[in-house]
Amino acid sequence: MDDDELLERFAGNTLPAFPHEEHLHVVFAQSARADLDATINFLRDGIRKMAAANGNPGAYHDTRTVAWIRLVVAARAGFDGTFDEFLDAHPELRRRDLLDEHYSPDLLNSDAARAFFAEPDRAPLP
């Protein structure tokens, strides 16, 4: 599916699944169309809607969402290619444990970090 269809299906909560690389792809596609704040709001709204529709509104984690967006948007700066080419150029983004370089488990797993974005306590985000 192309980026436009992906964003439409994400916004309409009609994606059949939403694994890690789909999260990255939505950020990649949306950040080509909007600034950082609008991209964050788009993902926040969509993921919250998806979690609620799946009967698990508590699954949303604001710090994880915003941190991943910031990592993808920073890596995307100046990039002109497809999503697959982007992932090939930035294989570190495939690592689901990448946030561990920026956050301690105590902070990342806290209720406060789940509810509101927390700045990292290990290494700054871009």
Where are these regions (language model features)?
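Conserved, aromatic- and glycine-enriched, well-ordered alpha/beta core segments
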Residues: G12-G81
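A charged, amphipathic interaction segment
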Residues: H61-P126
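Sparse, context-dependent recognition of short Cys/His-centered cofactor- or disulfide-binding micro-motifs
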Residues: D3, A53, D88, E92
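Intrinsically disordered, low-complexity serine/threonine- and proline-rich regulatory segments
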Residues: M1-N13
